[in-house]
C-alpha cells in the first residue's frame, strides 16, 4: 500500500473510534443532543477584538513529543487560561495520540465562558454533531485529511449548526483549497502532519496569499512572546498555543505574557 504517513495512521484510528462511539450513541441521538445544547458563542467577534488573539490549548500529549503534561483537572487549566486573557480554549479530543477525550471538552465547556474549540481529526458528519452536543463553538477541519468534496460538506455542516470552522493548512495549495471551500478562519500549522517536521517559515509564506477578511491563526511553534510578535509581524490575527503553555509551570502567567505582548502598542497590527 506504500508507506503510510503519520496522518494516515492517526486517521485510521480516528475512523475506528468514531465507528465505536456511533455504535453506542446513534447519529440521530447525537443530533438530538446537539439541538438541545446552548447556542454557540460568536467566535469571529472574539477573534476580531483588538490585539493578537491567544487560543490556549488543553493538550496532554502529541505524536511528536509523547506525553507533555499530566493534566489532572482540565477545567482548572482552562479557567487559568481564561483568567490569563485567552480569547478561546482549544481542547484535544483525539484519544490515541493526544490522550484527549470528550470528557475533557465537557469539563472545559462547563468551566469557561469564552469560545471552546474541539481539536480533533474530523472526517465524518457524526463528529460535527458530537462537537455541538458537547458544547463546542468551533472545530478544526484539516485540509490534508480531507478530499475537497468532504472538506466543503463538513464546513457547510459546521456552519449550519451555528459553529465556526478553523480550517487548517500547511501549504499554499491547501490554503487555496480552504478558500475555495469558503473558509473564513484559517489556521496555518507549521507542523507537517504527514512527517511531523516543523517549518517555522510556513506562516510567513502562506499568509500574504490570504484575503484580509480571512482571520489568520498561526499554529505550532509559539514558545514565548518573541514567537507571537514574529507571527504578528507576518500578518497573524491570533496564535494557537498548546505545548508552550502546558509545560510552562504557570499557565495563567504564560498566557498573560502572550496577551500583554499581543496588545502592546508596539505589536504589529493585523491588516483587516
From Swiss-Prot:
Pfam families: IGPS
Keyword Glycoprotein recorded: no
Keyword ATP-binding: no
The reaction(s) this protein catalyses: 1-(2-carboxyphenylamino)-1-deoxy-D-ribulose 5-phosphate + H(+) = (1S,2R)-1-C-(indol-3-yl)glycerol 3-phosphate + CO2 + H2O
Pathway(s) annotated for this protein in UniProt: Amino-acid biosynthesis; L-tryptophan biosynthesis; L-tryptophan from chorismate: step 4/5
EC code(s) of this entry: 4.1.1.48
Gene3D superfamilies, per database record: Aldolase class I
Keyword terms, alphabetized: Amino-acid biosynthesis, Aromatic amino acid biosynthesis, Decarboxylase, Lyase, Tryptophan biosynthesis
Entry's Gene Ontology molecular function annotations: indole-3-glycerol-phosphate synthase activity; phosphoribosylanthranilate isomerase activity
GO biological process: L-tryptophan biosynthetic process
Family, per entry: Belongs to the TrpC family.
UniProt xrefs under NCBIfam families: PRK00278.1-1, PRK00278.2-4
The protein, known as: Indole-3-glycerol phosphate synthase
Source organism: Mycolicibacterium gilvum (strain PYR-GCK) (Mycobacterium gilvum (strain PYR-GCK))
Amino acid at each position: 500500500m506504500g508507506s503510510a504517513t503519520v496522518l494516515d495512521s492517526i486517521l485510521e484510528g480516528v475512523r475506528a473510534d468514531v465507528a465505536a462511539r456511533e455504535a453506542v450513541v446513534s447519529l440521530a441521538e447525537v443530533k438530538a443532543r446537539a439541538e438541545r445544547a446552548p447556542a454557540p458563542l460568536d467566535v469571529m467577534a472574539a477573534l476580531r477584538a483588538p490585539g493578537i488573539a491567544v487560543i490556549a490549548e488543553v493538550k496532554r500529549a502529541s505524536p511528536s513529543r509523547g506525553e507533555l503534561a499530566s493534566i489532572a483537572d482540565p477545567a482548572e487549566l482552562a479557567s487559568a487560561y481564561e483568567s490569563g486573557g485567552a480569547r478561546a480554549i482549544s481542547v484535544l479530543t483525539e484519544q490515541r495520540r493526544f490522550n484527549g477525550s470528550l470528557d475533557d471538552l465537557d469539563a472545559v465547556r462547563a468551566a469557561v465562558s469564552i469560545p471552546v474549540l474541539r481539536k480533533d481529526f474530523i472526517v465524518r458528519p457524526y463528529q460535527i454533531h458530537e462537537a455541538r452536543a458537547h458544547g463546542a463553538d468551533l472545530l478544526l477541519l484539516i485540509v490534508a485529511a480531507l478530499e475537497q468534496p468532504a472538506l466543503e460538506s463538513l464546513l457547510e455542516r459546521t456552519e449550519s449548526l451555528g459553529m465556526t470552522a478553523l480550517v487548517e493548512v500547511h501549504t499554499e495549495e491547501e490554503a487555496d483549497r480552504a478558500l475555495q471551500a469558503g473558509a473564513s478562519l484559517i489556521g496555518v500549522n507549521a507542523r507537517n502532519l504527514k512527517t511531523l517536521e516543523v517549518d517555522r517559515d510556513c506562516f510567513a509564506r502562506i499568509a500574504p496569499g490570504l484575503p484580509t477578511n480571512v482571520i489568520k491563526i498561526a499554529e505550532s511553534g509559539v514558545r514565548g512572546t518573541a514567537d507571537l510578535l514574529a507571527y504578528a509581524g507576518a500578518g497573524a490575527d491570533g496564535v494557537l498555543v498548546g505545548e508552550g503553555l502546558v509545560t510552562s509551570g504557570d499557565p495563567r502567567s504564560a498566557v498573560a505574557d502572550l496577551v500583554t505582548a499581543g496588545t502592546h502598542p508596539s505589536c504589529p497590527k493585523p491588516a483587516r
